[in-house]
């Protein structure tokens, strides 16, 4: 069985990629990050999520990105914006962007992959992300892959982005087809202390809209509903 590494949070995108990897027959090795994020409820969800997909091993890496701040997810002085409708969502880079986060995460994943002899790395970036986050764009992924093959001894590394051309509603549709239980995920940037999603941050707004477009009720609990 071919080994592969996945960058996994406790979100809907990660769950969908896990299901795709399982369908494709990979031996899955997962890596997650406790980087001081405001939404660390995802770490509690991801522990349960990886059990569903018979992940061979799951590493949680501690990194203190709060030392730099610069994002609403890593700096308590920057508030998470809330919205009433998808029409209100920002068109430029939002304050929830964590500078260089995917570069940091992919670098760790690359090291992990080389150590276990895996040449395939999966990440759940997609169309809805690439419009706002510079490190989710196809050209970024292509450039990182080129760097990875220059920087490692193993060579032949492929960065897989199975969701890259999908909108959020297409991702949910794919996951539902593959039997993903989205009840065990959380996407919220600003969850309550008891891990309820706010329902109005950028991530919640996009997620709720995606389920609505699929005529399916989002199975998780929200503060407002």
From Swiss-Prot:
Task: Write the Enzyme Commission number(s) for this entry.
Answer: 6.3.4.20
Q: Which Pfam families did the record assign? A: QueC
Pathway(s) of this molecule: Purine metabolism; 7-cyano-7-deazaguanine biosynthesis
Supply the CDD domains for this chain.
Answer: QueC-like (cd01995)
**Cofactor mode of binding and number, as noted:** Binds 1 zinc ion per subunit.
Q: Which cofactors does it use?
A: Zn(2+)
UniProt binding sites for ATP: 8-18
Q: Which terms does the record give in the GO molecular function aspect? A: ATP binding; ligase activity, forming carbon-nitrogen bonds; zinc ion binding
Task: Kindly state a single biological-process term from the GO annotations of this entry.
Answer: queuosine biosynthetic process
Among PANTHER family, the record links this protein to:
7-CYANO-7-DEAZAGUANINE SYNTHASE
This protein's name = 7-cyano-7-deazaguanine synthase
Q: Which gene encodes it?
A: queC
């Amino acid at each position: 069985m071919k080994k592969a590494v996945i960058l996994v949070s406790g979100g809907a995108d990660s769950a969908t990629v896990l299901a795709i990897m399982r369908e494709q027959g990979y031996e899955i090795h997962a890596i997650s990050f406790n980087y001081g994020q405001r939404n660390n409820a995802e770490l509690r969800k991801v522990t349960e999520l990886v059990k569903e997909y018979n992940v061979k091993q799951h590493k949680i890496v501690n990194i203190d990105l709060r030392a730099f701040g610069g994002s609403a997810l890593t700096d308590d002085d920057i508030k998470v914006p809330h919205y009433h409708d998808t029409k209100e969502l920002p068109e430029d880079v939002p304050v929830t962007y964590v500078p260089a986060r995917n570069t940091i995460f992919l670098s760790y994943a690359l090291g992990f992959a080389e150590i276990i002899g895996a040449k395939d790395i999966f990440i759940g970036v997609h169309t809805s992300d690439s419009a706002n986050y510079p490190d989710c764009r196809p050209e970024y992924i292509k450039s990182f892959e080129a760097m990875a093959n220059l920087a490692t001894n193993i060579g032949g590394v492929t960065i897989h982005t199975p969701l890259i051309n999908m909108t959020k509603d297409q991702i949910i549709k794919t996951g539902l087809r593959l039997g993903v239980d989205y009840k065990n995920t959380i996407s919220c940037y600003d969850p309550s202390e008891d891990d309820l999603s706010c329902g109005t941050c950028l991530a919640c707004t996009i997620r709720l809209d995606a389920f609505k477009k699929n005529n399916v009720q989002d199975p998780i609990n929200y503060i407002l509903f």
